[in-house]
Amino acid sequence: MIYVTFTPYGAFGVKDNKEVSGLEDIEYKKLFNEEEIPDIMFKLKTQPNKIADELKEEWGDEIKLETLSTEPFNIGEFLRNNLFKVGKELGYFNNYDEFRKKMHYWSTELTKKVIKSYAQQKDKIIIQVAEAISDLDKTLNLLSERLREWYSLYFPELDHLVNKHEVYANLITKLGKRKNFTKSQLKKILPSKLAGKIAEAAKNSMGGELEDYDLDVIVKFAEEINHLYEKRKELYNYLEKLMNEEAPNITKLAGVSLGARLIGLAGGLEKLAKMPASTIQVLGAEKALFAHLRMGVEPPKHGIIYNHPLIQGSPHWQRGKIARALACKLAIAARADYVGDYIADELLEKLNKRVEEIRRKYPKPPKKKKKEKPKAKKKEKKGKKEKSKKKKDKKKDKKGKKERKVIGKTKSRK
């Protein structure tokens, strides 16, 4: 077996990890072209096994790479201690200043490539898009509330009749004035029954009259809110496409929004794939988990996976068990997505079977256990001798206080 250590300018190997005292003791060498060194270093960082296979074919023997998880090789220790000396002998450096400059350049180029590859990862884009949608939702809620309060000065009854912010903004954009809220116009946008109620409310509205230019400002504000709703739909469609490409198993089990939020909370698909099911189950419930660890309160049964329909639509005593089953399947789905396998249909079938089993097994809530009150500690009865001693001590203290003399200023003799 060949024990191999990499340096920025080449790969070096010896058989059976033998001692190395000089360049002549190194049996296998593969020197790199200076222009290709940053690319080779990046490849070594991201695909070390591929490079090991290439060396195996070239050198014709089994390869063992020195990594952070292995014990240091003898050849590795020699090269690290003599990096400049060996490089100079091989013709890479003429002096120490040149060595420092080249090492700095190679390290900088490697860092740039790592950052570039990190930014190109699709799961990082998924996280940003999901966060953008979340920010838009908060903004839309805030602006819609402002629109409702503002337009209620003119048509207050509409606020109670239309619950959805998007529909409310759409009505103001298309109709504007109260006189335009006729049944025929409203039926183009809303169901007939609701259209009739709004038309009747518009006729008998208690709202005040506004000037045309005041009303135009409100209508333009509503138009901007509508544009934001359209942008949100575009982002959601884009997120759905990304999730189906990068995490089809998670998307099938958890849905687009919940799956993207899980990837975001984990910090990426790779990190989510490395998480155990117990951690995935409580993602998003960190505060409750820390409260359990610090103060001993009940641990959380679920985090953001509570938003899954299987958990939300179940009775409270079944939710913890269903959350555990869902988290187990999501952990498998994340690993399958990371390696590029599609097993979502099989996972979904097993999950549904497990949920049905839980619902059959626990149809009724468990009986509540009565909490036993902690017994108060009985005060130990003090003996008569101890009581008499305390009384004597108190009497002595009182006598001592009376006997004490107060020392003040003495009067001067005349």
Swiss-Prot record:
SMART domains: NOSIC. Residues 358-414 are annotated as: Disordered. It comes from the Archaea. One of its GO terms (molecular function) is snoRNA binding. Residues 246-360 form the Nop domain. Belongs to the NOP5/NOP56 family. This is Uncharacterized NOP5 family protein MJ0694. It comes from Methanocaldococcus jannaschii (strain ATCC 43067 / DSM 2661 / JAL-1 / JCM 10045 / NBRC 100440) (Methanococcus jannaschii).
